[in-house]
């Protein structure tokens, strides 16, 4: 569907199409990150499947996942994910395409034994579920009803998640004082912060913490 960029005339189908495009761009970024980490997921890597498979108790499930997570199959899945995201951007979604991405995302979550990027992975699952609802209801009942149902699902999940996150931060003294911000940044992938980094100063840490708290708590409004 061609996009109409006039905000006043946006309908459910147009809004869903915008979400598809933004989501697909995010999906490409995530998938490129996974592809760049192929050395870490090899049989000799830090996240080797022969070790992680020991957590799977059911034999037939373990055998099925052994096939899915062979290095070649896993890489092919990631490349197919990129191609599917491209189709989502330039052509648009379908129930089959979204179902493939949804099942593939579940496999990736299993591969990492849960969320790899935390909130990003959670929101990926939320948007995929919303799109699955939209195309499932749309193909079986009504396209506009499906689009509205999918959008409502994504909105409710997103708004409540951010609001709850902000509320928890508001109740925690380490977030109100800025200490949690410094701890988080020091433990991040690019941390620890240099001793004289401006974000390690308490004043800026407090500003940053309260910016997050207020932004997340104000999300429903």
Please tell me what each predicted stretch does.
Residues 1-221:
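Alpha-helical membrane-anchoring segments
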